[in-house]
């Protein structure tokens, strides 16, 4: 497993179930992990993509200071991604989608010629040979249903940059009473234990 990149995106801080599950997983790996880079996308937010930043991500000789900062940040985040063997993503469902903070991370690392390339046969992802584990928590029960729009999105954007070995772990029914919530966390931990076995 060696090098692990952890992405947290919950707005709930110490009350976050997704962060707790991610911590549980990473700690279970123990000495099998050489290094862990943890990036809390809420505590240290990525700027929202706009026209100026989008222009800066293409590079050039006449960048504004803000564009230079965004490009340097993008380069650093992509370097973290390239140097990792396993990527662990905490992705709580907010209003049927991923948190804004996680979307901002994807927006700044999805760069033509760097993390993907355009070819005559369509786009090709350039970040390959890595395992992705997504822990997604939800207040209700959405797995495999029409309201689960975030999993198709994550599969698409991850695959777009070359990350196709993706495993999802679900913590569901967390706002449906104490008994259901406890069962949801137990089920998620059981799934994570199978991954770490």
UniProtKB/Swiss-Prot annotation:
Its EC number is 1.6.5.-, 1.7.1.17. It catalyses: 2 a quinone + NADH + H(+) = 2 a 1,4-benzosemiquinone + NAD(+); N,N-dimethyl-1,4-phenylenediamine + anthranilate + 2 NAD(+) = 2-(4-dimethylaminophenyl)diazenylbenzoate + 2 NADH + 2 H(+). Its cofactor is FMN. Binds 1 FMN per subunit. Keywords: Flavoprotein, FMN, NAD, Oxidoreductase. FMN binds at residues 10, 16-18, 93-96, 137-140. GO terms for molecular function: electron transfer activity; FMN binding; oxidoreductase activity, acting on NAD(P)H as acceptor; oxidoreductase activity, acting on NAD(P)H, quinone or similar compound as acceptor. Homodimer. HAMAP family: Azoreductase_type1. PANTHER family: FMN-DEPENDENT NADH-AZOREDUCTASE 1, FMN-DEPENDENT NADH:QUINONE OXIDOREDUCTASE. Belongs to the azoreductase type 1 family. Quinone reductase that provides resistance to thiol-specific stress caused by electrophilic quinones. This is FMN-dependent NADH:quinone oxidoreductase 1. It comes from Photobacterium profundum (strain SS9).
């Amino acid at each position: 497993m060696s090098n692990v990149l952890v992405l947290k995106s919950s707005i709930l801080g110490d009350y976050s179930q997704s962060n707790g599950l991610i911590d549980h997983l990473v700690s279970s790996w123990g000495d099998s992990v050489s290094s862990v880079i943890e990036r809390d996308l809420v505590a240290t937010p990525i700027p929202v993509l706009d026209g100026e930043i989008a222009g800066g991500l293409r590079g050039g000789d006449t960048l504004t200071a803000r564009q230079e900062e965004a490009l340097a940040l993008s380069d650093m985040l992509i370097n973290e991604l390239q140097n990792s063997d396993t990527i662990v993503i905490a992705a709580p469902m907010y209003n049927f989608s991923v948190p804004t903070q996680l979307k901002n991370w994807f927006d700044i690392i999805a760069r033509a010629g760097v993390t993907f390339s355009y070819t005559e046969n369509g786009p090709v992802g350039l970040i390959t040979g890595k395992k992705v584990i997504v822990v997604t928590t939800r207040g209700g029960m959405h797995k495999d249903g029409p309201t689960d729009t975030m999993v198709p999105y994550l599969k698409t954007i991850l695959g777009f940059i070359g990350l196709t070995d993706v495993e999802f772990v679900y913590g569901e029914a967390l706002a449906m009473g104490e008994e259901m919530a406890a069962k949801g966390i137990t089920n998620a931990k059981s799934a994570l234990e199978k991954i770490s076995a």
